[in-house]
């Protein structure tokens, strides 16, 4: 018996993002074979988005680019960013999912950031580089991320993306009530 295939284009070749997409879709559609393909998709925002709106726009820009340059069943984009909220600085990710001319936007959990980390970001550094320097790691953004380091591995960048993707899929899982 041949298994049906769901093709997902991910707006990044970062293995954390591609794996999160595969994990989310495998959990949601266990009866299907999930084919995830990473694509270099420009965000159109700074390399380190420093606002909620830039982060959201980066995810939307990536998913739009993927739709224009590849054929798939679903298009996923994840954009990590930071902002300074009333309770302090935090990092988070926006999720954009496109399917059949519909778009769903979601956001991952907020991770409070140490003030010294946020100050380095304000000075123009990227979060992954700051965390690598602070924790003496190499390319942490393609591994557990700041989330993994600051939670001692109890959560990771990938687990946060996986959960956020599953939540952002709700309109596609229940199209009859998301009109």
From Swiss-Prot:
Keywords: Hydrolase, Magnesium, Manganese, Metal-binding, Nucleotide metabolism, Nucleotide-binding. It catalyses: XTP + H2O = XDP + phosphate + H(+); ITP + H2O = IDP + phosphate + H(+). Binds 1 divalent metal cation per subunit; can use either Mg(2+) or Mn(2+). Belongs to the YjjX NTPase family. Mg(2+) binds at residue 71. Homodimer. GO terms for molecular function: ITPase activity; metal ion binding; nucleotide binding; ribonucleoside triphosphate phosphatase activity. Its EC number is 3.6.1.73. Phosphatase that hydrolyzes non-canonical purine nucleotides such as XTP and ITP to their respective diphosphate derivatives. Probably excludes non-canonical purines from DNA/RNA precursor pool, thus preventing their incorporation into DNA/RNA and avoiding chromosomal lesions. This is Inosine/xanthosine triphosphatase. Its cofactor is Mg(2+); Mn(2+). The lineage of its organism: Bacteria, Pseudomonadati, Pseudomonadota, Gammaproteobacteria, Alteromonadales. SUPFAM superfamilies: ITPase-like (SSF52972). Substrate binds at residues 71-72. The keyword Heme does not apply. GO terms for biological process: nucleotide metabolic process; thiamine metabolic process.
């Amino acid at each position: 018996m041949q298994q049906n295939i769901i093709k997902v284009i991910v707006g990044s070749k970062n293995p954390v993002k591609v794996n999160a997409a595969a994990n989310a879709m495998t959990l949601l559609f266990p009866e299907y074979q999930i084919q995830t393909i990473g694509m270099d998709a420009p965000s159109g925002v700074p390399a380190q988005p420093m606002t909620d709106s830039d982060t959201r726009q980066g995810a939307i820009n990536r998913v739009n680019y993927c739709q224009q340059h590849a054929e798939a069943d679903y298009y996923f984009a994840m954009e990590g960013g930071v902002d300074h909220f009333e309770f302090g600085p935090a990092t988070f990710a926006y999720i954009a999912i496109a399917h059949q001319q519909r778009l769903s936007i979601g956001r991952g959990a907020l991770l409070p950031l140490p003030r010294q980390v946020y100050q380095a970001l304000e000075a123009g550094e990227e979060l992954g580089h700051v965390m690598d320097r602070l924790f003496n790691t190499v390319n942490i953004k393609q591994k557990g991320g700041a989330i993994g380091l600051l939670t001692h591995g109890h959560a990771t960048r990938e687990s946060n993306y996986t959960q956020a993707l599953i939540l952002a899929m709700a309109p596609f899982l229940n199209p009859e009530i998301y009109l």
